[in-house]
Amino acid sequence: MKKTLIFAVGMAVGSLVLSGSARAHHGEAGRYIEEVVEITGTVVETQLVNPHSILVLDVATDGKNVRWQAEMGGAQQLIKSGWTNDVKPGTKVTLTGRRLKSGAPYMNLTERARVILADSGKVVMQNANYGQPAPNAQ
């Protein structure tokens, strides 16, 4: 009985601790919520991995290349939503997503976002809520 109670309490405490970590991991405190920006650049690298895939690209800004990173959903999520191998190094893409508050060249593409092949206009990825205002926008 005592071992069962200790185990149950341990599991409950562990669940609370882990749920707080997950909530903090997906928190919006570091990102613009209302402001969605668009950038166009050349893909340097794609990392289709879990839990979040990364797209790295060079964007011409004021006559020089700035290296951007864009965080997306996991590999399986992207593949199920239609992601193809069209996005590879050297491909020119246009990204629409949310930029960090700090102004760092980092974009979140997990909601209200899309990826377009710049040369053909083909939409490679678009979230279901693309084009909608932020949930708390007035």
Question: How does the language model describe each region?
Answer:
Residues A8-V17:
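Bacterial N-terminal signal peptides
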Residues M1-T4:
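Positively charged n-region of N-terminal signal peptides that target proteins for export
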Residues R67-W83:
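Beta-strand/loop nucleic-acid-binding surfaces
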